[in-house]
Amino acid sequence: APPEPVYPGDDATPEQMAEYVADLRRYINMLTRPRY
């Protein structure tokens, strides 16, 4: 599995937060994708 995205912190810029959320979604999708 890919490494879990690191939370950028409470003082992160909106761009950093958006990138983190996108990475987190991709990470969760990889974890929950069924493996046939």
UniProtKB/Swiss-Prot annotation:
GO cellular component, one term: extracellular space
InterPro entries reported for this sequence: Pancreatic_hormone-like, Pancreatic_hormone-like_CS
Disulfide bond sites: none
Modified residues (Tyrosine amide): Y36
GO annotation, biological process: feeding behavior; neuropeptide signaling pathway
Membership in a protein family: Belongs to the NPY family.
Name of protein: Pancreatic polypeptide
Gene Ontology terms for molecular function: neuropeptide hormone activity; neuropeptide Y receptor binding
A Pfam family matched in the record: Hormone_3
PANTHER family: NEUROPEPTIDE Y/PANCREATIC HORMONE/PEPTIDE YY, PANCREATIC POLYPEPTIDE PROHORMONE
Keywords, in A-Z order: Amidation, Hormone, Secreted
Keyword Iron-sulfur part of the UniProt annotation: no
Function recorded in the entry: Hormone secreted by pancreatic cells that acts as a regulator of pancreatic and gastrointestinal functions probably by signaling through the G protein-coupled receptor NPY4R2.
Record localization: Secreted
Cleaved signal peptide residues: none
